[in-house]
Amino acid sequence: APRPFVDKAGIFSGAKERIFQSSPDMFETMSSPLNDDLSEVIVSRESATMVPNQWRINLETAAETQITFNQDRHPEITSARRERFTINRADGFESRVTVTLPTGYSDGTRLPAMFWFYPREYSEQEAYDEGFQTFNKNRFPNVGARSMSILTLLGYALVEPDVPIVGPEGQRNDEYPHDLRNTLAATIDEIVARGWVDRSRLGIGGHSYGAFGTANAMVQTPFFKAGIAGDGNYNRSLTPAGFQSERRYLWEAQDLYIEMSPFFQADRLSGSLLMYHGMDDHNVGTHPIHSDRLFHALEVLGKTASMYKYPFEDHGPATYETTLDLWARWV
């Protein structure tokens, strides 16, 4: 695992001296120096099984004093079994998947699964692989108010696949539908082959560009029974000057914009789609009208869909009341 460090460098000589480095079995970062020569510092320390806490450390004497005493409030989730592995798509591209299985899971038990993802664009395999130089297995699996790992308490497997969209500069999204389908298909085949998941009981979800990907997955594939899409964009013609890593204007790549827009493929939606949107979403690409229009289209087409809009929420639920309501709808 990568080991964060701090070096002291001579301005004129360029000579370096390492004054701090994380332990190999921990994830430690320097939070703050306490004096000019960095002989005393505050360090954040955590591991895969130890919740993050802050320590005051004298780097000269190695004396340590713990100054925060955070506790793991969700041991039944953080102790869940996590598997991280590589899959091979039909086109030969290799990508990574993380699967979280409920605490106490018995091998061979096929579970319903929830996919949660966010597509990202890359120029090639090497560019994708470079992003994993910073992955650290010693990070503690924190649980937030909207962490989908909470679903493991209900007996679901959580599947978090990387979904690389690959193409050269200026043509990044030309293979978007194919890359999306191929990655999801390869992921499903692998987790089914490992005996973890029931292929007939799959859901999918995501937030923002992940919501866009979710709606696309449900119109481009027959794999999923249900989807959750939050604060998404579903009609790329409403972002005509580009989006994500797409730099072509709508008028240069009109067919691509339409092909990538779930709104224009809404008649092909399989499964049930739940959408949620903050009514004060100020993100330039995800105006609430996107959810309004897609919901109306699905309603006209007789598809099973629901939409929940939350007042005073921006691009991502923040309030206690909204979070509780979302979980009530999701489960």
Protein language model features and the residues they cover:
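Active-site-proximal cap/loop segments of hydrolase catalytic domains
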Residues: 126, 130-331
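Short beta-strand element of the alpha/beta-hydrolase
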Residues: 108-121
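Flexible loop residues that form catalytic
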Residues: 46, 59, 119-120, 207, ...
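Surface-exposed, flexible loop/turn segments at secondary-structure boundaries
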Residues: 24, 49, 62, 72-75, ...
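Short, well-ordered beta-strand core segments
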Residues: 41, 114, 227-229
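Active-site donor-binding loop signature of nucleotide-sugar glycosyltransferases
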Residues: 21, 69, 89, 119, ...
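Short hydrophobic segments within beta-strands
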Residues: 100, 116-117, 205, 276
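Non-catalytic accessory segments flanking enzyme active sites
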Residues: 3-109, 146-149, 153, 190
